[in-house]
Amino acid sequence: GVILENDEEIYADNVIMVVGRDGSNWLNGVCNKHGIKMTNNQVDIGVRVETNDIVMEEINKTLYEGKFIYESSVGTKVRTFCSNPSGHVVVENFSGVMLANGHAYNDPKLGSKNTNFALLVSHSFNEPFDRPNEFAMEIGSLSNKLSNGSIIVQRYGDILKGRRSTYKRIKEGFVTPTLKEAVPGDLGLVLPYNVMKSLIEMVEALNYVTPGIASDHTLFYGVEAKFY
């Protein structure tokens, strides 16, 4: 049960606490203080992908948001999430860490010529490390440092070549970034090997479903993370 602020005691077999993602650290402290056993959920780490609407046209028109899951060669699960046809990539401020996200407007007049969606790699931890949210926050913080407090954007072709993207190469690409403040950089310096390898394998697999997504001009914004 629970004891309320006015000292009222409520007895129950099960208690649901709704503290939100920002309240996870507080809840962790409360559980540790009172010896309450906890089970950690997974954390998802990845990127926001952006390409031309025409590449995603069939999926956009038929499904609006396709749901694809891929088992990588390193044993991770990769999934697509939150697709936004004719949408915009945006910045999400999560407890002071800038993360990539995306949205689309209901009014077609406000739309772009690009589709964006998340590619997320799931990670679970046990011992000796059992703080998955902290792990994702550290990766997001590193991305912020390398982009001077912003979001990194990188061409898929530059990722495959192992080089950072530059403003010149981004400008010469066929996909115009909708997040103008994103800073060209190298996500290979931020994302762990298993994450990057999983993302590349997923994009190559998606290319069979929606040809053109594995183009050199496809953009990766990082980092995107989902906390549970």
PLM features: what roles do these ranges have?
Residues 1-228:
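Residues forming the flavin
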